């Protein structure tokens, strides 16, 4: 049995061991491509894969657990082990990761608890999740013949809190459930975060996260170790080789040669985990959101990250630059030729059916009635859209409407006619409507949850609760008697295309095409407005013509030999009679500074 130890260095069976790791999140890459990505990691000369674990995927509703198909973490670990790769697993409840709500399930927002704290209610919820998760991970520990070297207790907690009782509680939950491998924390490498977010006083291993200036950052970590009498190896648990992207902002890139030199600096002093090695995709509604002041800044669907592998998993110029550096400076780590996947293109896929959301609403959702508007989470919904509907009489020729405390984006319609779209800070501003006095009208408000904040000071903000939190005013009073239509859009097969379509309304558009040999491709959405797309029922994620991304990645495994269908839900009234599949992503140039 192989033994892994952390002393003055990392040791495998008593021999000094340098961890050469790359991050591949199993939940961002289809299972059919796990081997491809893991093989390319091994081909680089690396020996370990690292992955987070996304709680909100494994327990989407309280007490409902999923570990099958794309969530089969055990299969991912076994695939890595079959290739001779070790694993670092980060099952901490919070993962950040530019992932919806930092990986926490949204149903926690309906509970009376303080998240990421020693609050007993929160610890109890984590414990129930760990009962399911850790029973599946423990057999894969190195001690039990698997490939897991070590596991994380919490993620960058020093950038959030200093509740050491919480960190100790998570550690205890893990150890009580059979975790025997070394445990660690990862934080920014400066004193304040290390002091707040680690358990160095309890002899829990400490790692740092950074993306450059390795000598300086490691020196800060070494200083912290020395203060506490620790003779530990240095490891960068997240070496940021690229960066994520947000709507309306430029694509962030990094020079391959500069990156290779920066990686060399890390390896001259310690061990590394490249974050990301393969970024993959935020399929569905799982993109995260940054916070800047009072603003939320949702991230795009692509998690390409300008990583060593591109979104579909093929080596990039960065991969080749790091591979060359490794061969030159660290020739003791054998390399292989990497694998490449083919892509495909397809022009002029015709529109075959279309239907307005308001027409097919009842086939997609059952209304929930209440006196005042309810939040998304109160309705048992976590992601997607929520339609609020009521009826009202107009008391003046020009009425004033206001949405009070709404998030994130609201589109208001009167009798099916678009009136106003408001986004974040605009919500709450007056909306003026010219109506026929005394006439009874239907008021519809379509609200989109564009992704919850995954990091920072707004993690506990009330804006994490989506939909309309207070109410809707006409003149100075709140309107009553609302119907709520939850639209998580997890049932596109129920769209009734036999119903009508009205120009300018949110609508579904269906496009049929045939494929002889499925290959990776991208759906060009540059002439559409905003929405989400599906292929054969799989949610590809969001699109928005503000950029910087104007396409959605379609993995080959989402396509079928023969007949295929793409359905586009578009909310702005912008669509095309034909769509196109391309070999490469479609991007929008936005002026700005790169990383």
What is each PLM-predicted segment?
Residues 72-89, 112-148:
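An active-site-proximal structural segment forming one wall of the substrate-binding cleft
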Residues 122-201:
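Active-site neighborhood of glycoside hydrolase catalytic domains
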Residues 34-100, 171-176:
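Aromatic-lined substrate-binding rim segments of carbohydrate-active enzymes
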Residues 63-69, 93-117, 167, 171, ...:
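Aromatic- and acidic-residue-enriched segments that line the glycan-binding/catalytic groove
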Residues 1-48, 78:
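N-terminal carbohydrate-binding accessory modules
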Residues 19-31, 55-73, 109-128, 152-163, ...:
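The substrate-binding groove and active-site-proximal loops of carbohydrate-active enzymes
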Residues 398-414, 443, 513-536, 543-544, ...:
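Aromatic-lined ligand-binding clefts that engage carbohydrates, nucleic acids, or primary amines
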Residues 176-177, 209, 213-317, 325:
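Catalytic-core region of carbohydrate-active enzymes that cleave or remodel glycosidic bonds
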């Amino acid at each position: 049995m192989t033994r892994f130890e952390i002393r003055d260095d990392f040791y495998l069976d008593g021999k000094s061991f340098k961890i050469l790791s790359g991050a591949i999140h199993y939940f961002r890459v289809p299972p059919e491509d796990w081997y491809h990505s893991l093989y390319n990691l091994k081909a680089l000369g690396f020996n370990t894969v690292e992955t987070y674990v996304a709680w909100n995927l494994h327990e989407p509703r309280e007490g409902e657990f999923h570990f099958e198909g794309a969530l089969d973490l055990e299969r991912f670990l076994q695939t890595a082990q079959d290739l001779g790769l070790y694993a670092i697993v980060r099952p901490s409840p919070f993962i950040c990761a530019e992932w919806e709500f930092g990986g926490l399930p949204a149903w926690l927002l309906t509970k009376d608890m303080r998240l990421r704290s020693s609050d007993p209610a929160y610890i109890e919820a984590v414990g129930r999740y760990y009962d399911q998760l850790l029973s599946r991970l423990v057999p894969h520990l190195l001690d039990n013949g698997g490939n897991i070297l070590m596991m994380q207790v919490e993620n960058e907690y020093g950038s959030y809190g200093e509740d050491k009782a919480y960190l100790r509680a998570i550690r205890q939950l893990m150890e009580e459930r059979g975790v025997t491998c070394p445990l660690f924390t990862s934080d920014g490498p400066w004193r304040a975060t290390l002091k707040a977010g680690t358990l160095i006083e309890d002899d829990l291993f400490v790692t740092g996260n950074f993306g450059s200036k390795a000598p300086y950052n490691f020196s800060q970590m070494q200083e912290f170790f020395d203060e506490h009498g620790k003779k530990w190896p240095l490891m960068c648990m997240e070496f940021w080789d690229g960066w994520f992207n947000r709507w309306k902002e430029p694509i962030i890139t990094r020079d391959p040669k500069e990156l290779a030199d920066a990686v060399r600096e890390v390896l001259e002093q310690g061990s590394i985990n490249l974050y990301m090695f393969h970024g993959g995709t935020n399929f569905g509604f799982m993109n995260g959101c940054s916070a800047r002041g009072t603003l939320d800044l949702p991230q795009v669907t692509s998690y390409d990250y300008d990583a060593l592998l591109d979104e579909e998993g093929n080596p990039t110029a960065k991969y080749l630059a790091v591979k060359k550096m490794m061969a030159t400076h660290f020739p003791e780590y054998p390399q292989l030729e990497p694998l490449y996947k083919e892509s495909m293109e397809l022009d002029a896929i015709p529109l075959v059916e279309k239907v307005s959301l308001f027409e097919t609403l009842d086939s997609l959702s059952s209304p929930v009635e209440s006196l005042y508007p309810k939040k998304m989470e109160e309705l048992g919904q976590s992601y997607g859209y929520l339609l609020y509907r009521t009826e009202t009489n107009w008391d003046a020729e020009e009425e004033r409407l206001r949405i009070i405390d709404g998030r994130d984006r609201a589109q208001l319609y009167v009798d099916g006619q678009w009136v106003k779209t408001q986004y974040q800070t605009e919500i709450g501003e007056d909306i003026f409507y010219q109506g026929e006095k005394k006439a009874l009208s239907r008021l519809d408000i379509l609200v989109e949850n564009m992704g919850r904040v995954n990091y920072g000071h707004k993690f506990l903000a009330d804006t994490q609760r989506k939909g309309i939190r207070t109410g809707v005013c006409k003149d100075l009073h709140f309107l009553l008697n609302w119907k709520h239509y939850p639209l998580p859009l997890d049932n596109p097969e129920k769209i009734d295309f036999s119903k009508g379509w009205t120009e300018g309304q949110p609508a579904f558009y269906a496009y049929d095409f045939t494929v002889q040999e499925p290959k990776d491709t991208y759906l060009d959405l540059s002439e559409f407005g905003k929405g989400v797309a599906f292929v054969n029922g799989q949610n590809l994620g969001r699109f928005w013509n503000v950029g910087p991304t104007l396409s959605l990645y379609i993995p080959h495994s989402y396509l079928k030999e023969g007949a295929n269908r793409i359905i586009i839900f578009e909310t702005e009234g912008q669509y095309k009679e034909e769509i196109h599949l391309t070999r490469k992503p479609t991007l929008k140039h936005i002026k700005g500074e790169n990383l």
